[in-house]
């Protein structure tokens, strides 16, 4: 019996020693209730972001006789060298060049319905077939020239299609008819 009493006393001593070295869970933390609240609630969303000084230098796109065709259509027309570089970029990324043309409206328009849909000018007629396997940018520009001869009053654009992801990755106007 004496041995059992000694061992239980040793266990009790160890447990008490471990409890004595433990730190209380919130020792040293202060309550936030003692800090004064000096922040006012600002529910005005106009103070979050502002372009105040820049408003005077912004301009509005003139909509009369200045139609927008693609994302960067406000830039000057691309020269033959710039077109060649764009097509080389398209081919370097592994995209398939496609040519499309539109004979009546080279811009988005809504003739049949007020809501966007198939007949709102976003879908153009494809020129021949996509140029699968094309590795030379001059071949694409030769097709643009051929399309110009066939339809001189049409808008012609070049599209880069990623056939792996099944998405159109790039699109730009290669030719606009006279007067546009």
Swiss-Prot record:
Biological process according to GO: photorespiration; reductive pentose-phosphate cycle
Alphabetical list of Pfam families matching this protein: RbcS, RuBisCO_small
Signal peptide (from-to): none
InterPro entries: RuBisCO_ssu (IPR024681), RuBisCO_ssu_dom (IPR000894), RuBisCO_ssu_N (IPR024680), RuBisCO_ssu_sf (IPR036385)
GO cellular component, one term: chloroplast
GO molecular function term, any single one: ribulose-bisphosphate carboxylase activity
Principal location: plastid
Highest taxon of the lineage: Eukaryota
Keywords: Calvin cycle, Carbon dioxide fixation, Chloroplast, Photorespiration, Photosynthesis, Plastid, Transit peptide
Targeting presequence: 1-56
CDD domains: RuBisCO_small
Subcellular location: Plastid, Chloroplast
Function: RuBisCO catalyzes two reactions: the carboxylation of D-ribulose 1,5-bisphosphate, the primary event in carbon dioxide fixation, as well as the oxidative fragmentation of the pentose substrate. Both reactions occur simultaneously and in competition at the same active site. Although the small subunit is not catalytic it is essential for maximal activity.
Anything else known: The basic functional RuBisCO is composed of a large chain homodimer in a 'head-to-tail' conformation. In form I RuBisCO this homodimer is arranged in a barrel-like tetramer with the small subunits forming a tetrameric 'cap' on each end of the 'barrel'.
Similarity annotation: Belongs to the RuBisCO small chain family.
Assembly: Heterohexadecamer of 8 large and 8 small subunits.
Name of the featured protein: Ribulose bisphosphate carboxylase small subunit, chloroplastic 4
Species name: Solanum tuberosum (Potato)
